[in-house]
């Protein structure tokens, strides 16, 4: 049996649907065939794409609709499973990378702890060699108490002591020369002070003797120069002023004589 559902109009782009079934619908399933319908002449001439409309499934039976829905659900579920699997694989790779990085950091932390322990031992030995008391701070004790969870490699203290033997010998060799030089410094320091005192006394006496020889000569020269300047002075002669004349507005002989006596220098 063949059922043909034609398009409502020739100009519409909806395809024709042909349902081919050899038996009735209850006995078997129909196979839908999608046949493209003729396009409109105006749309071919213009070449503009038309908006795709959602296909209506009014021509399908309920069984066909349910089958189509099941297929869509299967495809969606498969894509979701693939996406979830890819995400899980990515997360697993991240976990592996983080575990490797954590192991590297733990190893580095352990090596740093060993190094600090060796440095503490070296510091204590140097303090004991210098005659100072080994200082055990509270921070070191707290760090050791907190670090009990992390196990140190056995024999780390022994290896640190073996590594520190050669540096300690070098430090001892470097510290021994100053200890030998210290008595020499104590003996040479007073001699140096005495030499400085004697040099200072000699310098002061020499400068005083030089100035004592130079000062009288300079005083004599200064006195001679003062005397020569006093001898070479020209006596001051006041200008001649007429006590009475047409240039005087009034007669003041006493005031004029007083002015003359004030300006005449004493010879």
Curated annotation (Swiss-Prot):
Q: Which UniProt keywords apply?
A: Acetylation, Activator, Angiogenesis, Apoptosis, Cleavage on pair of basic residues, Cytoplasm, Developmental protein, Differentiation, DNA-binding, Endoplasmic reticulum, Membrane, Myogenesis, Nucleus, Phosphoprotein, Signal-anchor, Stress response, Transcription, Transcription regulation, Transmembrane, Transmembrane helix, Ubl conjugation, Unfolded protein response
**PTM annotation (Phosphoserine): residues:** 61
Residue span of region Nuclear localization signal (NLS): 69-85
Q: List every stretch annotated Basic motif.
A: 65-87
One of the entry's Gene Ontology molecular-function terms is:
RNA polymerase II transcription regulatory region sequence-specific DNA binding
Question: Region Leucine-zipper: which residues?
Answer: 91-126
The UniProt annotation puts the region (Disordered) at: 35-60
Residues in the Lumenal compartment per record = 199-267
Q: Which residues cross the membrane?
A: 181-198
| Localization annotation | Nucleus; Endoplasmic reticulum
Q: Locate the site labelled Cleavage.
A: 185-186
Q: Which family does it belong to?
A: Belongs to the bZIP family.
Give the comment on domains: Isoform 1 N-terminus domain is necessary for nuclear localization targeting. Isoform 1 C-terminus domain confers localization to the cytoplasm and is sufficient to impose rapid degradation. Isoform 1 N-terminus and C-terminus regions are necessary for DNA-binding and weak transcriptional activity, respectively.
Cytoplasmic topology: which positions?
A: 1-180
Q: How is it modified after translation?
A: Isoform 1 is ubiquitinated, leading to proteasome-mediated degradation in response to ER stress.
Protein name, entry field = X-box-binding protein 1
**Tell me, how does this one assemble?**
Isoform 1 interacts with HM13. Isoform 1 interacts with RNF139; the interaction induces ubiquitination and degradation of isoform 1. Isoform 1 interacts (via luminal domain) with DERL1; the interaction obviates the need for ectodomain shedding prior HM13/SPP-mediated XBP1 isoform 1 cleavage. Isoform 1 interacts with HDAC3 and AKT1; the interactions occur in endothelial cell (EC) under disturbed flow. Isoform 1 interacts with the oncoprotein FOS. Interacts with SIRT1.
* One GO BP annotation of this record: cholesterol homeostasis
Q: What does UniProt give as GO cellular component?
A: cytoplasm; endoplasmic reticulum; endoplasmic reticulum membrane; nucleus; presynapse; RNA polymerase II transcription regulator complex
Taken from the record, one Pfam family name reads bZIP_2
